[in-house]
């Protein structure tokens, strides 16, 4: 398949450059020779952390998400800084958003969030051996979160209630559910 469906970029026009994303419009030549436009969101990428306490609870944060106009419960996450190793970002975001540090930070998977219009890749990690860090780095000045620790069953209920509503957190909870099911095989 690959190259058979490839689109050739003819022209790129940057429309907006902000603190988090850049927006561009590409003129492309389609495989059939026709031309079209593609609106693209450029994002530096992000990390997300499935943090598991010694009591086997999932550490999450509740925060207001303006695009959704509501608060949702999510796993800790944050944007990659230019040139930064995703593992370093994961360790930093875990500490900043939750006050926890960990003994083990293991990469799980990387995935595209919305490949139809954005190039954002999230690197998902699992953190274990958590302990509260004294004098932990705080939240960014524009972040306001509440810390929540949930059992797997509680997290599944939050998904049903749409309190957990974002893809990275749903993927994280489903991963934990799969791990639990595999234990009992």
UniProtKB/Swiss-Prot annotation:
Q: Which domain of life is it from?
A: Bacteria
Q: Which residues form a coiled coil?
A: none
Q: Which GO terms describe its biological process?
A: nucleoside phosphate metabolic process; ribose phosphate metabolic process
Select a single GO molecular function from the record's annotations and give it: hydrolase activity, acting on acid anhydrides, in phosphorus-containing anhydrides
Record keywords, A-Z: Hydrolase
Q: What is its EC number?
A: 3.-.-.-
| Alphabetized InterPro entries for the sequence | NDP_pyrophosphatase, NUDIX_hydrolase-like_dom_sf, NUDIX_hydrolase_CS, NUDIX_hydrolase_dom
Q: What does this protein do, in the record's words?
A: Involved in the activation of the NAD-dependent methanol dehydrogenase (MDH). MDH activation by Act involves hydrolytic removal of the nicotinamide mononucleotide (NMN) moiety of the NAD cofactor, changing its ping-pong type of reaction mechanism into a ternary complex reaction mechanism. It requires the presence of magnesium ions and is also able to use ADP-ribose.
NCBIfam families in alphabetical order? nudix-type nucleoside diphosphatase, YffH/AdpP family (TIGR00052)
Tell me, how does this one assemble?
A: Homodimer.
The identity of this protein, by name, is Methanol dehydrogenase activator
């Amino acid at each position: 398949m690959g190259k058979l469906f490839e689109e050739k970029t003819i022209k790129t026009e940057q429309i907006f450059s902000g603190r988090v994303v850049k927006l561009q419009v590409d003129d492309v030549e389609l495989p059939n020779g026709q031309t079209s436009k593609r609106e693209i969101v450029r994002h530096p990428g992000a990390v997300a952390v499935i943090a598991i306490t010694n009591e086997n609870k999932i550490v999450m944060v509740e925060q207001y998400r303006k695009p959704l106009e509501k608060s949702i419960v999510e796993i800790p996450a944050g944007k990659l800084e230019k040139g930064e190793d995703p593992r370093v970002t994961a360790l930093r975001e875990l500490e900043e958003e939750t006050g926890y540090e960990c003994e083990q930070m293991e990469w799980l998977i990387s995935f595209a969030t919305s490949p139809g219009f954005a190039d954002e890749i999230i690197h998902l990690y699992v953190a274990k051996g958590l302990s509260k860090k004294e004098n932990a780095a705080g939240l960014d000045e524009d972040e306001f979160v509440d810390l929540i620790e949930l059992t797997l069953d509680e997290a599944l209920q939050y998904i049903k209630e749409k309190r957990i509503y974002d893809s990275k957190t749903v993927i994280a909870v489903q991963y934990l559910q799969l791990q639990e099911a595999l234990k009992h095989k």
